[in-house]
Structures are given as structure tokens and as C-alpha cells.
């Protein structure tokens, strides 16, 4: 990816020698292929932690994993398991040592504009006293976009009642900014503010708890205050699609790893799964795109997920569940909810409750 590559190539560019890299996921996954090639160019040691159905299912049954789920739950956001097995394995083989500092690229994509919807190219607004009559409609549009993107882990819960509850919480956050008394605020900046205040600070950064669990030191250089302040000032046309970010990385070409030969396109590692997925998609040729994606999430994602995140539940349970889970995080949210509240929303509550 761009962000972790920036970290690694930047360290090399500025003369850091005691650096080692690692990747994880399915064998021959496209990111690992690119990472191996980049690490070789940088002359940094690189290790791959293969995740397959056998080793991950075994790990999910261990006390280590169960304690991780229990002890990293904070009642604010769903527990993230992205690299919990990789760190476990790499520590076990002594590739990662106690004294090591783990550095990743969170959250360069968000900070540099990668999460601003492309439709903002034509719909951005400047909020100020002059257009205060449009304030409500603009805010409604911003919140609607934000809710659709980040609050649909379960299709069944994505209803008007719940969206109204979320809307009220988000509007309170916006009102705290007291926009009416400010000179100018870009509407896309509000969208980024909502994500920063919620998903980024509560969930994405919470993924660092994996390293805390293993007592590993860590750094997040792309959350540097000066870096954040710079990107807050960048105009929309240079943030959409990370335009400025990508152009500068390519122009600087730290350590020579920003040319086309180091870019690998997304592929599904298993040819068999690719063929089966293609066949099933062909059967949905007369179905809507929405219905196809719902089918894919329910029946296929279990087999294509690079980290086997859905394996925390039996396949039979996943395909029999009709609540339209978005991905593995949907299922993890049930774990977090049960730890925090004693039950999750899909379990039958007592009649007197």
C-alpha cells in the first residue's frame, strides 16, 4: 500500500538501517507480492506470515485469542483482529523482538483525502453566514453520506429508526463546532471531521491495541500533528482521490520504489475461488447489483477474505443468518457488544426485558 510503503521507503531514504518488514494474509496475496519486491529493493529483511484456514481456525480457539477479544474491548468500538495472529506468530519465531517498535501507515489514506467521496467534485459547499439558509440541507447531505458509508455493518439494523438515532448524535457533534459564528468551513471538511471524531479515533486507531496486548511499542508517524495540519489546509481538488499525495510520492520516489513495476493490481489468490465466484456472478446477470453484493457477502466473502476474518464463526452459521452482515467486522461487533452489555442484539432477550 501507499502508506506503509511511504514509511519503509522514507526510513531508507533518511538512513535508517535497523528496519525489518513483514506482511501477512493468504499465500500469494497481491499485497505480499508487492511488499516482498519492495523490501528487496530497500535491502530490508522481510518475513511473510501465511494465514490459512487451518492455522487461523486453530488460533481462534486459543486462550490467547479469547483473552485478546476480552481485554482489548473498550465498549466504544468493535475489537479489531487484523494483525493479531501475525504478531503472535512473528513473536513466536522471534522475528519480532520485545525491544522492537512497530510502525504502520495508519491513517495516511484518510488524512490525505482518500475518504472524501468523489461526488464532492461537483457538490462541495462553503458554509458561512451568507448561505446560512442552505445550512440544514448541506448538513443533512453530509450526515447522510457519512451514515451510509460507516454505519451499515448489519443490513437489518440499517433502518430509519436507527439512522435517526445516529443522525442526532452526529448533529450534536457538528453543533459543538458552532459553525454559524465562523467565517468559512468547507463541507468536505465536516465530513472528514465526523470520520476523524468517530471511526478513525475510536476504531481505526484502536487497532493499535493489538500491539499493547503483546506489550510491543508502536508509532504512528502519519498522525503527526504537523502532517495533519498540512493536509487540513490542502484544497479539495488536490485531496480528491489523494491527488497531491500520490503525485508527490511518485515525484519524490523515495528509494526507487514508486515506479510502476512496484505496483501490483488486486487479485483473488485462489484460481478456484475466482472461477466459482465468476460462475455465480454470471447466474446473477439479471439480478440487481445490490442483490449480487448481498449474495456475495453472505456466501462468498467467507472464502475470499484475505485474513479469514469470517472464520471466527462457522460457515453454516454465516449463511443461515439473514441479517445481512457486511463483513467480518459485523460478526466481531457481536463479540464486543456481548462483552460490554452481556448480550448482543441478535440473541433473544428475556421476556420481561
Named regions from a protein language model:
Residues 14, 38, 63-67, 113-130, ...:
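Short secondary-structure boundary/capping segments
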Residues 87-161, 210, 215-225:
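Active-site adenylate/phosphate-handling loop in enzymes that bind or generate adenylated species
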Residues 78-95, 193, 204-208:
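A conserved donor-nucleotide-binding helix/loop in the catalytic core
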Residues 97, 153-353:
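Adenosyl-5′-phosphate
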Residues 1-17:
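A phosphate-binding catalytic loop at a beta-strand-loop-alpha-helix junction
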Residues 2-4, 27-29, 53-56, 107-111, ...:
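Short, solvent-exposed loop/turn segments at secondary-structure junctions
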Residues 18-37:
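Catalytic or ion-translocation cores adjacent to nucleophile or general acid/base/metal-coordination motifs
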Residues 32, 36-70:
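A conserved beta-strand->alpha-helix junction
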Amino acid at each position: 500500500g501507499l502508506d506503509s510503503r511511504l514509511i519503509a521507503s522514507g526510513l531508507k531514504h533518511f538512513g535508517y538501517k535497523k528496519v525489518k518488514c513483514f506482511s501477512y494474509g493468504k499465500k500469494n496475496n497481491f499485497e505480499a507480492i508487492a511488499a516482498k519486491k519492495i523490501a528487496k529493493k530497500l535491502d530490508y529483511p522481510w518475513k511473510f506470515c501465511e494465514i490459512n484456514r487451518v492455522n487461523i481456525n486453530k488460533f481462534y480457539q486459543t486462550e490467547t485469542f479469547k483473552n485478546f477479544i476480552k481485554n482489548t474491548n473498550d465498549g466504544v468500538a468493535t475489537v479489531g483482529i487484523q494483525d493479531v495472529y501475525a504478531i503472535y506468530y512473528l513473536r513466536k519465531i522471534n522475528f519480532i523482538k520485545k525491544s522492537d517498535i512497530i510502525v504502520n501507515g495508519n491513517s495516511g489514506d484518510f488524512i490525505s483525502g482518500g475518504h472524501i467521496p468523489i461526488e464532492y467534485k461537483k457538490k462541495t459547499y462553503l458554509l458561512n453566514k451568507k448561505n446560512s439558509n442552505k445550512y440544514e440541507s448541506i448538513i443533512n447531505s453530509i450526515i447522510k453520506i457519512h451514515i451510509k458509508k460507516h454505519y451499515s455493518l448489519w443490513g437489518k439494523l440499517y433502518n430509519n429508526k436507527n439512522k435517526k438515532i445516529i443522525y442526532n448524535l452526529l448533529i450534536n457533534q457538528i453543533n459543538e463546532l458552532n459553525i454559524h459564528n465562523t467565517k468559512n468551513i468547507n463541507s468536505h471538511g465536516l465530513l472528514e471531521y465526523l470520520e476523524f471524531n468517530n471511526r478513525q479515533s475510536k476504531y481505526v486507531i484502536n487497532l493499535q491495541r493489538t500491539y499493547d496486548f503483546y506489550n510491543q511499542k508502536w508509532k504512528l508517524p502519519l498522525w503527526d500533528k504537523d502532517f495533519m495540519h498540512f493536509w487540513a489546509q490542502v484544497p479539495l481538488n488536490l485531496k480528491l482521490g489523494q491527488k497531491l499525495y500520490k503525485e508527490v510520492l511518485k515525484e519524490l520516489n523515495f528509494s526507487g520504489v514508486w515506479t510502476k513495476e512496484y505496483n501490483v493490481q488486486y487479485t483473488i489468490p485462489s484460481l478456484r475461488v475466482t472461477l466459482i465466484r465468476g460462475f455465480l456472478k454470471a447466474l446473477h446477470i439479471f439480478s440487481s447489483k445490490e442483490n449480487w453484493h448481498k449474495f456475495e457477502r453472505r456466501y462468498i466473502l467467507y472464502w475470499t477474505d484475505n485474513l479469514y476474518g469470517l472464520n471466527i464463526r462457522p460457515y453454516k452459521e454465516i449463511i443461515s443468518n439473514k441479517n445481512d452482515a457486511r463483513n467480518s467486522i459485523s460478526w466481531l461487533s457481536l463479540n464486543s457488544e456481548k462483552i460490554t452489555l452481556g448480550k448482543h442484539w441478535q440473541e433473544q432477550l428475556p421476556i420481561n426485558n
